[in-house]
């Protein structure tokens, strides 16, 4: 994790992207990828502790760091599940004001960014845009996962997710596990392009681990 933060691919090190007054959101995967209690420490806890340590060393105040569970349209995590994934220490350290689940039905959390070139909605949690640095911690290893799917789906809404979470993209694209030919993946990438252009206008990028 430390190596990924210090030597990211095609990106500046995390420590150079933030400063003392920066606001940071760390989004992480929900229970759909790893929902059972492991004998070893959950990677979410291990990684987030390292990320927070790096941010603090860069001068970011603890009160300016938010942890956001990106569960898309899945149910929200319970406190017990949060403690299983993140450990009681992190849960108590951040509390309910700084540790929360994405709410795809709360208009105050959401922002509509526009449409893709084919007219598909792009709507995500506003933390993606409002944070000085948005970080996504990906812990689900699957061919259909990764890239813009993390943000566009994990922090999306019904309005935007409905375009690719239905039979047509899966049937037309052979398999969602085939990134090159997957219609699902292409739709998500189109939405990601809108997110990226919006962030670029603010001089920002998503930092993915």
What are these regions (language model features)?
Residues 1-3:
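N-terminal amphipathic/basic leader segments beginning at the initiator methionine
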Residues 6, 31, 139-140:
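Residue-level marker of positions within ordered structural domains that often coincide
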Residues 6-18, 122-130:
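Short amphipathic alpha-helices and their capping/turn segments at secondary-structure boundaries
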Residues 11-75:
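N-terminal active-site beta-alpha-beta segment that forms phosphate/nucleotide-binding
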Residues 38-47, 81-86, 148-153:
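"Short basic amphipathic alpha-helical interaction patches in structured regions
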Residues 62-116:
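Acidic low-complexity segments
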Residues 92-209:
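Conserved, well-structured core segments that form the ligand-binding/active-site neighborhood
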């Amino acid at each position: 994790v430390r190596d990924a933060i210090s030597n990211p691919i095609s990106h500046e090190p995390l420590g150079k992207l933030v400063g003392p007054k920066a606001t940071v959101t760390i989004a992480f995967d929900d229970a759909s990828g790893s929902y059972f209690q492991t004998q070893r420490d959950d990677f979410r806890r291990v990684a987030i502790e390292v990320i927070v340590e790096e941010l603090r060393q860069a001068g970011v105040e603890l009160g300016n760091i938010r942890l956001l569970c990106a569960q898309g349209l899945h149910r929200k995590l319970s406190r017990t599940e949060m403690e299983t994934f993140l450990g009681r220490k992190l849960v108590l350290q951040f509390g309910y004001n700084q540790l929360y689940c994405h709410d795809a039905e709360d208009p105050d959390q959401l922002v509509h960014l526009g449409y893709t070139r084919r007219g598909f909605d792009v709507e995500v949690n506003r933390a993606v845009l409002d944070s000085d640095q948005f970080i996504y911690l990906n812990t689900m290893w699957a061919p259909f996962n990764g890239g813009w799917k993390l943000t566009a789906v994990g922090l999306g809404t019904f309005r935007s997710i409905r375009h690719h979470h239905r039979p047509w993209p899966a049937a037309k694209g052979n398999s969602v596990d085939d990134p090159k030919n997957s219609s699902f993946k292409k739709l998500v990438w189109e939405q990601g392009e809108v997110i990226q252009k919006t962030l670029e206008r603010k001089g920002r990028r998503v930092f993915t681990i």
